[in-house]
């Protein structure tokens, strides 16, 4: 059983339909992905990102994935880079200003002080962050991140690291691309699976203690 538990919800991973998966070949990369403000390539079925600038250098899907989405992948920094494994969903791009528009952004070893967290673009007024002293540069991590009607979460190696409820969820009918960000770093993303989340209510209560 690969269920993921967040507050009052159980995500049924194995029952969540797969929307996108498989090795990223040069043909699939050209067909399925777009690049902005960075160098993104594919190698041995993985996405490779390189961006020396302090900004959002992204690779994003050409197609949209409306609804509640789970981003499931393995990510690592490429040494000597030491920070920022970043993933996005409910994403749109502001072509006029060449900037990220609406999106939920999850980072592992980000925010300058080594944190794992979630933030909402483009205002960045909604965020939840926590230290991740367990992170080791160059080590591969299994990241599972997504949202259910604005209830955002990120698991790393099967452990819930942080969750956040957005009182004004992004409209996934309008903003529904997915992608990855290299922020002044080099990263590798492999074994990507995009799923439509199937979940069930999981009422939680305390057992009496006295």
Regions found by a protein language model. Give the residues of each.
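Flexible glycan-contacting loops in extracellular carbohydrate-active proteins
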Residues: 164-193
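Secretory/extracellular carbohydrate-interaction modules
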Residues: 51-118
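Extracellular carbohydrate-recognition regions
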Residues: 1-35, 201-210
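Short, aromatic/His-centered strand-loop micro-motif at the edge of beta-sheets
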Residues: 120-142
